Each structure stands twice: as C-alpha cells, then as structure tokens.
C-alpha cells in the first residue's frame, strides 16, 4: 500500500508496532520507490504515543487503518488480546483525528462480518445480512464498523470508507516486500510457501468434510497489490470527492471462490514445487465458504482485481525464496 500511495504522489507515514512485521520492509520500499517513508514504531493502543505522531506530522489528511491482530484461530484462543488491540486502537484514532484536522479514514474490515452467508446470498454484496461472527476476530470487525457508523452519524467532521477485504495473499512482484509473519504463520499462503521450502514439515488442511466440491473451505483470494490499489482509489474518493457520502462500504475481492485444496494444487502447478500436506480436523472459527460480489467497487471506485491466481501464488513463492536467500527465514 505504501508503494502504491507513494507512486500516486502521496507523502506516507507508516505507523507499526512491528509485532508481526520487520523494520527491513522499509529498505524494500526505498528500493522500489526511491523514497524512504517516515516510520514511527508505536503501539496504537498507547494514546499518548499516537498523539505524538499527529503532533510530529501536522499535515496528515487521511489514515488507512489496518493495524490489527488478524488470525481467526488465534482470536478464539486469545479473545481479549483481539478485543483490546483491534477496538482500542480504532477508538484512539477516531478521538484524535478531529483535533488534528484529519479528514478521512479508510478502515480495513473483513468479509468475516458476513459470517457464514446463506447459499442464496453468495456471492455476498455489501447489503448482505450480517450473520453472527464465527470468531472474536470477526466480531472485532463488526464492532469497529459499528463504532465508525455511530461516530460519523453523531456529526463527527470526518469521512470514512470501510473496505471489506476477502483474503489478501501474495507479495510485491519485485520480491522486495511481502508478508513477514513472526513465528508460526496463521495464514494459509505463508504456511504453503514455508512447507514448500522445507521450513515446515507439512501443511495441514483443516477439514475435508465441508459442503463444497472438494470438501475443503472456499475463500475469495485477493492479490495484495490489487488490494493496495483499492486503498489508493478509496483514499482519493474520501479526500477529493466532495460529493461522496460521509460513510460508504465496499467489498474488495475477486468475485470468485477457490478452495484450500485448489490453492495448494494451483501453487504446485505455478511453481513446479510439491507441497507436503495432509487433512486435519476442522478449525474452530472457520466458515465453510464465502466469496464476494465486487461490482460496487468496480463501478463506484473504478477498481477491479486483475491478477491471475497463478501469478499471485508465484509472487508468494518468489518472496519466500528471497527470504531464504537473505537469511530472514
């Protein structure tokens, strides 16, 4: 996202506590863009530290807020960690934004707010009824959406676009930046690439008895670079389009669903590398199948996911190879 923003002419300040990333990402950003963005290592739950960022950079116009804990399985085991991190950080930002004249916030929500959609509601539109969240992670996204809605409807002087991501995957095509999970990855693709590399002994596919064509879960996998382009178009709409509503919602996905098994097989075909995998029991909190109807983002934002799945998975493998070469994993 920082790359796309810089290339679109924005001045970028990155704020991260590095709990699930690495400072070396900044080097990759500079190699790609020629610009070393400003960086502040703070925890957004610390309101005083967050306020100092606004004081240090008084010209901030907009915020893209995706600092959050994001693993469904972990959230079931550590619910309070998720509620504290994901909810408190947003409240701190919303309280500080008007004080410093920040006009808009793009919020990273999730398709988890739809829960397990009824079959007749697939692919889900933004108007699809919200089902009960299947995990604390999903519930934090639902709560945060409601907080933003309530705050804006109270008359707060800011605008927001809520982006409901489906499943972001892949790495920048340069292989200079990508996902850097600390410890055991909670997301599918890093686990696939680490298993293919031999770092992990085997990949477990959680559940093969779902009501899907091959029995494994179905998700809508969106390339991170395509997603980053959506961030830029959303930010432009919030900051520059005076006619845009104070609050709007968009699904950000491909409009297609792929099963976990399809992901593994497509990865093997795209890279020529075999993955050692096995079936395991279902994982608590996982939904069976979901994919998005993204025509609203196509028409209103002028945005569409364009990268083929095989290219996305190849980018993830190229990134994993670079991590090995650099001794980072």
Predicted feature residues:
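N-terminal Rossmann-like NAD(P)+-binding domain of SDR-like oxidoreductases, especially those catalyzing
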Residues: 1-171
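Short capping/connector residues at structural and topological boundaries
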Residues: 77, 119, 127-129, 142, ...
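Short-chain dehydrogenase/reductase
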Residues: 83, 133-142, 178-186, 190, ...
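A generic fold-level signal
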Residues: 77, 85, 131, 155, ...
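C-terminal substrate-binding subdomain of Rossmann-fold SDR/epimerase-dehydratase oxidoreductases
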Residues: 189-329
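Hydrophobic, Gly/Ser/Ala-rich alpha-helical and linker tracts in large acyl-processing enzymes
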Residues: 172-185, 192-195, 201
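Short helix-coil transition/hinge motifs at the ends and kinks of transmembrane helices
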Residues: 119-121, 174-175, 240-244
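Short, basic/glycine-rich phosphate-binding loops at helix/coil junctions
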Residues: 170-172, 209-210
């Amino acid at each position: 996202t920082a790359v796309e923003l810089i290339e679109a002419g924005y001045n970028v300040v990155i704020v991260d506590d590095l709990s699930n990333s690495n400072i070396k990402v900044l080097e990759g950003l500079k190699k790609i863009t020629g610009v070393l963005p400003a960086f502040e290592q703070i925890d957004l739950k610390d309101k005083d530290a967050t306020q100092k960022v606004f004081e240090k950079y008084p010209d901030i116009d907009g915020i893209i807020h995706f600092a959050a804990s994001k693993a469904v399985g972990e959230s079931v085991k550590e619910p309070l960690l998720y509620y504290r991190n994901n909810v408190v950080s947003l409240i701190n930002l919303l309280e500080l934004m008007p004080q410093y004249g920040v006009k808009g916030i793009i919020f990273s929500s999730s398709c988890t707010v739809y829960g397990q959609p009824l079959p007749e509601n697939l692919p889900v539109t933004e108007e699809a009824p919200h089902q009960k969240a299947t995990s604390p992670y999903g519930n934090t996204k639902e709560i945060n959406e409601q907080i933003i809605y309530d705050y804006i409807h109270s008359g707060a002087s800011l605008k927001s676009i809520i982006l409901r991501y489906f499943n972001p995957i892949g790495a920048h095509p340069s292989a200079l930046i990508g996902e850097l999970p600390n410890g055991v990855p909670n997301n599918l693709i890093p686990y696939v690439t680490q298993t293919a590399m031999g770092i992990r002994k085997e990949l477990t596919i959680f559940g093969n008895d779902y009501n899907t064509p091959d029995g494994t879960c179905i998700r809508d996998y969106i390339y991170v670079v395509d997603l980053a382009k959506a961030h830029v178009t959303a930010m432009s709409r919030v900051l520059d389009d005076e006619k845009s509503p104070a609050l709007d919602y968009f699904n950000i996905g491909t409009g297609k669903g792929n099963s976990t098994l399809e992901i593994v097989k497509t990865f093997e075909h795209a890279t020529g590398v075999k993955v050692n995998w096995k079936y395991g029991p279902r994982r608590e909190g996982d939904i069976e199948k979901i994919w998005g109807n993204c025509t609203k983002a196509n028409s209103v934002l002028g945005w569409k996911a364009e990268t083929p799945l095989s290219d996305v998975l190849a980018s993830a493998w190229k990134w994993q190879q670079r991590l090995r070469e650099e001794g980072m994993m």
